[in-house]
Design a protein with these regions (language model features):
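Concave beta-strand-loop units of leucine-rich repeat
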Residues: 9, 14-48, 53-72, 78-145, ...
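C-terminal motif of bacterial Sec signal peptides marking the signal peptidase cleavage site
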Residues: 2-4
Length: 225
């Protein structure tokens, strides 16, 4: 049994409950959340998750999920919030995640996907919040794909070099209200043009507000956990 997984509601399960205990809680209807602060390394523990219908929020704070585990995550059809830290999902894994049609928020800061994997997420009708990092993404093409996401309101890109043209492509995201970029390689001139095109978007660059951000006190919807 794996220790170190804890639910958000400690009145239901004691802090430090194992992933198996949390799954039992979900199946019993006492919680809809699984929150693990240590890696799930046992394939047997992963298999216990397959097809569990009542999970709405699943968080791995220390990983580790790859493409094989993504096939199990993709079977959690009620999932609305998914956070996979230290999890190098590739394109196959992203295609599995794209089957989660109820997904609203996705956080995969250490992914290993290309544009093909990212494009598969454009089919998610309710995805409002995305936090993503992958060294394999072409920045401009990634932004062109993100501009097609139908419901995206909050976006955080980590170490993806979108440069000026990528930022201007993101101005086509008409529903976007919060944009966080870390190490994006964008010039001040491009930021000026973006703010003219998208005056309602809260802008945060390299962990700081842009000095021309028109909405400095906007509460970001992007998960940073």
């Amino acid at each position: 049994m794996l220790a170190g997984c804890q639910p958000s509601d400690t009145s239901i399960l004691e802090r430090g409950a194992s992933v198996r205990e949390q799954i039992r809680g979900v199946n019993a209807g006492t919680t809809d959340t699984i929150d693990c602060d240590e890696p799930i390394r046992s394939q047997a523990d992963w298999e216990l998750l397959r097809g569990v219908k009542q999970i709405r929020s699943f968080t791995l704070r220390e990983g580790i999920a790859g493409d094989r585990e993504a096939s199990i995550i993709g079977s959690l059809t009620s999932l609305e919030r998914l956070s996979l830290r230290h999890s190098p999902l590739g394109d196959d894994g992203f295609r599995e995640i794209a089957s989660l049609q109820a997904l609203v928020a996705l956080n995969i800061p250490q992914a290993d996907c290309t544009e093909r994997g990212l494009e598969s997420l454009s089919s998610l009708p309710h995805l409002q919040s995305l936090r993503l990092g992958s060294s394999r993404l072409d920045g401009l093409r990634a932004c062109e794909i993100l501009a097609t996401f139908p419901a995206l309101k909050s976006l955080h890109l980590i170490d993806i070099h979108i440069k000026d043209q990528g930022l201007l492509s993101l101005s086509e995201c008409k529903k976007l209200r919060s944009l966080y970029l870390d190490n994006a390689g964008v010039s001040q001139e491009a930021w000026g043009e973006y703010i003219i095109r998208q005056p309602l978007v809260h802008v945060h660059i390299d962990q700081a507000h842009h000095d021309r951000d028109p909405i400095k006190n906007h509460p970001s919807a992007v998960e940073s956990k």
